[in-house]
Each structure stands twice: as C-alpha cells, then as structure tokens.
C-alpha cells in the first residue's frame, strides 16, 4: 500500500474509531454466526423420515417470539408461520413470554414462567431458543457475567429431556432504537459474542436472526419488535436451519 494511502487510512481510522469498530464487530459476528448456521445444516438437520411420530418443535423466547406488536398476532407470530410452512409432520408451539430474560436473576426470568414449565412438559424434539433482547436492559445486564452459565444451564435442561431434542440458538434481532432499556450496543458487543462462543463450545448451531433482520427498520414499527413481514423472515430462517436448507 502506498505511504500516502496508508496514512490517510490510519487517519480516518482514528477520526472515526468508534464507528469503524462497531462496523467491524457487527461484520465479524455476522460472518461467524453465518458459518455456524451453515455447518449446522449439514450436521443437525431434522429428517422427518427419522421420526415415527409428529415432530414437536418448541419456540422458546421473549416478546419477539410471542409476536408482540404484530397486528394479527394469533396468526402471524413466527412460530405459527413456521408451523404452517413445515406442515402436518410438525407440531410447532409458541412458548414466548413478553419481557422474559434468559438470566435467572433478570427482572422477568424465563426460568420462573409457566411457559418454561410448559415447554419442558411438551418434551420437544426440536428447541429453538431466542432469548437475550431483554437481558440488555441495565437492571438485567448488571448480571452479564452470569449470562453464559445460565444459557448453558438452559441448554442442558432441554438436552436432558426424554426426547433428546436437537437445539438451535438464535442471535437477537437488531435494535433500531434504544427503548425500555433495550439497546443495540449490548446486543452486538455483549449478547451475540457470548451466544457465538457458547454455541461453539457446545457444538450447537446458531440461527443468525440479527443479519436476517438487519437493514430493515421498516419492519420494526416500534424499533424493537418485528411486524408480520419480519416474523415471516424469522420463520423462514428457522425453517431453513431445521431442515438444513
């Protein structure tokens, strides 16, 4: 690289370092998550022919899984859309809880909800976990050091069920505006790297919902929750992961 160009690049880096680093972090996380999802397609895809019963899919999550903010929530939340697309061989249930955290010490811990108990009793063959958005709230993220241990405990809990389910982790959706304490910085620099590292250590796939929903602010009327179109994109990403497409 010519010296003049190199110096201009270095100068630009120092002048815009925070923006530059944010872009680099997002890009690296997206690439890594995408690689994990691709690898999982080969090794963990669900083959309906391998099951002699209806395949039970538990969608564990927060308000985004629940479908908060969607006009026709009952029919357009992502687990319902996923179930319609997968067809009669699958039974997909929505175990989303608005405001829920993965953290056990969160202000509304998923561990303490009836939905967690119901998801356990469902004895799923497939578990899709999408928790982390509410964990970024300041009152919750003060327990950030506990996030990975609590996530691993949840993975181990579901993995020990009689059906021995296949488990997918999801990266959170983008945060287009800080609201209710939910913020993009903690998602990108806190949640996603932790999910990625944990998935690698546990040998589990990650569904990269962050990338799937990035650059689409029009699908987030309140800047946090996707609308029906966004929920459809989520369902498509989850289906592709489950079926190994």
Where are these predicted regions, by residue range?
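Conserved SGNH/GDSL esterase-like catalytic core that processes O-acyl groups on lipids
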Residues: 50-58, 64-152, 176, 186
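Generic enzyme active-site microenvironment
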Residues: 60, 128-130, 169-170, 206
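Conserved beta-strand segments of alpha/beta enzyme cores
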Residues: 91-93, 166, 203-205
């Amino acid at each position: 690289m010519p010296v003049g160009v190199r110096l201009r690049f270095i100068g630009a880096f120092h002048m815009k370092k925070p923006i530059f680093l944010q872009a680099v972090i997002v890009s690296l996380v997206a690439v890594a998550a995408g690689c994990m999802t691709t690898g999982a397609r080969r090794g963990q895809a669900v083959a309906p022919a391998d099951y002699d019963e209806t395949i039970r899919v538990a969608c564990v999550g927060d308000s985004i899984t629940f479908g908060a903010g969607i006009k026709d929530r009952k029919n357009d939340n992502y687990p319902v859309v996923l179930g319609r697309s997968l067809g009669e061989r699958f039974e997909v249930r929505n175990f989303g809880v608005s405001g829920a955290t993965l953290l056990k010490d969160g202000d509304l811990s998923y561990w303490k909800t009836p939905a967690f108990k119901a998801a356990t009793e469902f004895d799923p063959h497939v578990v899709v976990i999408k928790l982390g958005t509410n964990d970024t709230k300041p009152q919750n993220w003060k327990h950030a050091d506990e996030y990975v241990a609590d996530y691993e405990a949840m993975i181990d809990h579901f993995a020990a069920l009689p059906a021995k389910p296949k488990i997918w982790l999801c990266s959170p959706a983008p945060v287009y505006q800080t609201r209710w304490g939910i913020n993009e910085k903690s998602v990108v620099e806190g949640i996603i790297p932790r999910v990625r590292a944990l998935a690698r250590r546990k040998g589990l796939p990650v569904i990269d919902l962050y990338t799937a929903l990035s650059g689409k602010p029009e699908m987030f009327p309140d800047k946090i929750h996707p609308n029906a179109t966004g929920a459809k994109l989520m369902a498509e990403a989850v289906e592709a992961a489950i079926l190994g497409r």
